[in-house]
Structures are given as C-alpha cells and as structure tokens.
C-alpha cells in the first residue's frame, strides 16, 4: 500500500476497473427487489456546473447505497438535448445546432465519468436523436386518434426577435425574457393535448405520493386549481347574446355592480367598432399581456363598453367594462364583479367610482368597505329572499334557483389549461402532422415516421430552417399534395417520458417494452430542483397516465419518492465601472483575507493586488461570474473530495454554500482515513476471536452505534450530512485507538472495514482502493452494507455520577445490570462519598437508572 493518498491515480484506475467489470450495467432480475434511481437529465449546454454535480452526487450516493443493501439497481443517464440555446449558440458559433449539441454531449459525458458516477451507459439516450423522438411522434398520432389532441387558434405572446411563442411566465414587463423585445399578441393555429381530461386524476393521485415533499404537492394542487362553483348566464340588454360567467361565490350574486370582459371578448370587439377610444384601449391591453401571477399586483385598468348586462335575479341593468385583469384564456373571458367582496373588483370599482354594494355581513363583524373588500363568508344581506342565510345556505339556494330558471348550473372548474405543445422553433421534434390543401390536418402515417429534422443546416437567426425549406415541407398524402407541420414540440414533451424509455432504451420496434417497463417502473427515487415542481413534474405525471391508458405501463404514477435538492451558492466579488455598473470578478481571480472567525474581511484581485468589493453569497451564475468549474476542482482535489464536500456541507434540500476551506477539510479527512489504514496494514496481523478489554469493547460499541445511525440517516431520513458527521466522529475515536495487541488490531480492522463500506457510496474511488488494501477480492460495489451487531451495543458497565446536595462528588463504574441497592452500596463504599456523608443524616437517595445517584444529607 502506498503511504500517500494520490486521488488522480486512484480515481482513474477505479473508473477503468468499473468499466471493465461492467459494474453498473442493470438487467431485469425477476424476484429480486429492484431500485430505479434517477436524477433529472441535463441540457447539454457545454459544461457541467456545480448544481449538476450536487444533483448527480445525490443520485449516485443513493444508488450505491441501495446496491449494497442487495437491491437490483438501475441508474441511467441521458441528455435533454432540444431547445432554443442550441439555436442561439449555432448562430453565434456559425455551426449547426446538432453539431454543437453532440460535441457538448461528448464533453459532458467525460465530465460525468470523471466524477465516478455509476451510470448504466448502455441506456444512454439523447432526445434529439430520431431513435428517441420517432416514438414521441408515434405516441402523439395515437393521442390524436383517441381525440386527446386538437388544433385551435390561440392568442399567444409573440417574440418578434426570437420568432417564437412565449409562455405568460416568460414575458417580463411586456418584453421577452430572452431577447428583451417588446412582445406582441398574435393569433396562430396551435396543437394542444387535453391535460384537462386528466385534471381530477392528477389532483386526486397526489394523495398517493407519500414520498413527495408536501411543498411540491401543494404547488401542483394550486396549479391544477380545483374549485366548485356555478356557471351563470347574464343576458345582454337589447340583444340575443348572453355573458356566461363562472363564480365560486354565488352567495354574493346580489352584490354584482358591473361585469368585466377580456380585451379579446366578442362583446368588446363589437363595441370597439363604433368607439375609437375603446378600440385603442383594447389594442393596448392586447399588447401588454402579462403572466397570471403579475395580475394581482399590476394596476387595474378598464373602459366602459356602453353595453349593459341584465342581472338574472333582479333584472337590473349592469355596465359591461373591458378590464385588463380578465384573461380570455380563462373561463369564458368574462367575470361578474362584486367589489364589496373581492379585492381586485374593489380596487377597480374604487378607481372608476363604480357602486360597491355589500351583501355579506362577516362573522367577525368588521364590515367597513371603505378600506378594502370583505372577502370572508358570513350572513347574507341585501339579497331579497336569501337574507339571513349563511353563505353556504345561500350558495345552495341560489344555485338551485338558477338551475330551475335554466340560466345556471353547478360546475367543478379547474385552473389548469390544456397543454399547448406547438413551438415556432427549429431545434425540436417536428410535430407529426400534415396540412392538406383543403385546410384539414391529418397525422403522418406510421410507416413514414420518424419525421426527421434535417441536422446539417445553417441558422440565419430569423427563419426556422424547416420553415424556409420547401423541399422539407412538401410531401404527399394519399396521392394529394400536402405539407409537413413546421412547428416543433415544446421540449417538455421529451422530458415527460424519458424516464420510461430508459427501461428499454435499445428497443427499436416499440416506444417501450412493457415487460421491462413494468419491471423497473415506477422510479423509486427521483432527484431534481424544486423549480421543476409544476411544469415538468406535472407533465411527466400526465404522460405516465397516457402511457398507462395506451397499455404501455401498469402503474399510475411515474415517481415514488422525490428529493428536491437546494441551490449551490458561492461568494461573489465585483468592481464598479465608470458608470456605476458592476463588473463581476471570478472567485478564482481573488485573494481573500479572513478574520479570526473565518469570515471574509477583505479581497484583492490577484492580477493587480487592488481591492475588490464583496458581493456576498449568491447562486452560482454566469451573470455574477461566481461559478466554480467542477473540472478544476476534480483536478485539484479529486472527485471523492468534491463528492464528500457536496454531501457534507448541507442537508440535500437546503442551499449549499461553496467553501474552499470546506473542500480542503474534506480532503484532510480522506487523507486521515488513508493514513489510518496504512498504519493498520503495517502494524502486524490480527486474528479474530480475541477476547476484548473494556476499551476495545467501547470502541466496538462506538462503531456499531455509528453503523445504526448512518444506516438510518442514509436510508430513511436521507440526511447524508449527519451520516458523514457520525463517520468523522468515529474516525476520531479510531485514530486514538492503540495498535499494540492483536485484539487492538482486530477491533480496528473491523472498524475500518465498516467505515470504508459506509463511505463507499459517497467517496467510491478511495473506498474501493482501501477495500482491496484490506484484503478483499470482490468489488466493493457489490459488498454488503455493514450490519449492526446488537450484542456490541450491550454495555457491560455503566458510568454513574454521584451528586451530594447537588454537587458532583464521585463517578462510579458499575455493572450495567446493577440494581439501585447495589449502586448505593458501591457508592457508599467510595471514600469521596463517605467524606461528604460521614456523621450526617442521609435524608433522601434518588437513583436515575444507568445515569445518576442523587444523595441529600442534612
């Protein structure tokens, strides 16, 4: 055994050995417990960042631990390879997106291997490969045949620079989040999948997900947004038209004082024909569409259309206003406004001096509507025959009357909208539909799949290469001219089923092999950032149910247990330029001065020795130039050190603060473990079966207490940082242990053997090497997790503290099973106890078993 720990030499040797021994190749083994561990696959942007490293280290630690517990483990890896960044990079680098993407994949694959992650590379997939997306296209055509896919014109946020549709959340202050261009409103035909058909099941099945964080489930519940209410028809005065609205508060119907309609509503369009001022306002509303989340905080603007609606109960005429807070995409694009009992309606009514009519007396008695709306429920007032009813009673009574009159009905509503999957981009999966000359659309026949994306293209930054290529667009359908759809899928499509494709990634004649898919699915452990709590995780759950209903999988849900890791933070530094802007400086270019407590007291630029400003801890990002390159850290410290720091610095779901001193501390710990093993190997032999003295028994007790704690922390609790802390504490005990006798060496050998196995999932390279140095032949990856020897935990003796009148006077070692009487006898035989009790009246003796004996004397 080498005396010095050499990470780079050990790590390259171990990685080569794992590859040669095919250690991580997963095969179906019916009858054996399986464990499918999956970390969210990366976008191949060019290089891994520390957020990736944290995510994938967590997954690898869990996978390796489960393998040592005897499970049949699968841990695959692939690439979420489509998306706009590849197009932007292609334009910038004058290359094709495909070439840029595949080069990045090759580089990042080697980065992952250098970190020692135990992936089954035979299952590797890239979503930009036709072998992958052909099945996505096939599945889409099957959904179309089932009536779950449809095409409709939809008003979209159009970015005129990126030439693409933006989600509401991608519009910031009326501008595109990526390009900064002023966003326009545009109506274009788009393809949708009916996720709303599954809204109830998606909501109900959240209750099955015991292994998911409550926060994520709450976010999905809110996004799906189930509500019970009533749909009500308001007649339009002097017209045959009706305004249909949905409300969850029919008990406030008598408080309606105006109606609000979206700028795109037909009534608004009609009124604008004869009202230029209204037409101008509507145009402004259309071009300032914002995310739904912003509506609560933005200024409420509106204009009277001059049209009146008729109250369904009182016959009163109510003004109809165009309001910028009403969205055409939600419900019917119209709302009934009750300003006394809805804060948004109250703000609008106050601004435009519309009537505010209270119809609920709150239970709290606070009924001042001058300051704000009263949103709580209570007793109905000013509502004719419903006065005196509770809100719940009035809900039922009013809903019943509306139904009897034929102008309303109860309805369960969902906030969730159907999934618009069309994107006006090139680098994505072509939507497998054909547009015929008669205006109809039909699926591409199965024998013509996949519809391949041409990869050898030149990006001009304006038009999609497939849109501007007539040869690609043109085709035939039943002998008639047709054109390929030139939109591509939302990239959430690819990431909604990749976890299932891993189960049979090499199958080329089907989307999934049901037998293999049903063996591995559902995923036992899924790991990724909480930023994916809604869209990706919701779409993947939806897709899984679609796969089930197509007969490809049997389970209802894709992921049993979900772990959302926290962000990685790092110190940031900057200098101010002449205009007061911040020029961010990489931490690698800064020399740091620390105070006595280790906090940063000052910083200087390495190049010129001049001070730089300290920007504090923030998420690692390009914008603040505070990212730490994982490759640099692996080359400097070794992969095991980086992995150990990542797992030790914080609980997995909390933010992790990068610290060079913390990384150095992690390496010192590994060097200590190496040194101790070296000393044991050079100390002479050790035979098992030696009788042990009290100190040796105590060391074994510490070992097996640690095994018990680490087993629970690594498995049930997933508190890896406390598991590592316990192992570090154990190593402190082991370093103090003598090596003189065979019994000493026997206990130390057992302890190091178990320590190496406990650390193996976290620092696999050094542990594999130490495992060999300890004399083992089989790979550590297939060794058993250390078992707790319950007999070692049984203590022969206990240390008892003796207090006399509240002061510690003696410490006794007594047999572990000693009775209170025996402990008292031993205590009173002690000289120190006799000294403080002699000639005094012993008034009371209180014994806390195994801990303390209190004696009160007078």
Swiss-Prot record:
Its EC number is 6.1.1.4. One of its GO terms (biological process) is leucyl-tRNA aminoacylation. It catalyses: tRNA(Leu) + L-leucine + ATP = L-leucyl-tRNA(Leu) + AMP + diphosphate. The keyword Aminoacyl-tRNA synthetase applies. Its main location: cytoplasm. GO terms for cellular component: cytosol. InterPro entries: aa-tRNA-synth_I_CS, aa-tRNA-synth_Ia, Leu-tRNA-ligase, Leu_tRNA-synth_edit, M/V/L/I-tRNA-synth_anticd-bd, Methionyl/Leucyl_tRNA_Synth, Rossmann-like_a/b/a_fold, tRNAsynth_Ia_anticodon-bd. It is found in: Cytoplasm. Keywords: Aminoacyl-tRNA synthetase, ATP-binding, Cytoplasm, Ligase, Nucleotide-binding, Protein biosynthesis. Residues 602-631 are annotated as: Disordered. One of its GO terms (molecular function) is leucine-tRNA ligase activity. A motif ('KMSKS' region) lies at residues 619-623. A motif ('HIGH' region) lies at residues 42-52. It comes from the Bacteria. ATP binds at residue 622. Belongs to the class-I aminoacyl-tRNA synthetase family. This is Leucine--tRNA ligase. It comes from Idiomarina loihiensis (strain ATCC BAA-735 / DSM 15497 / L2-TR).
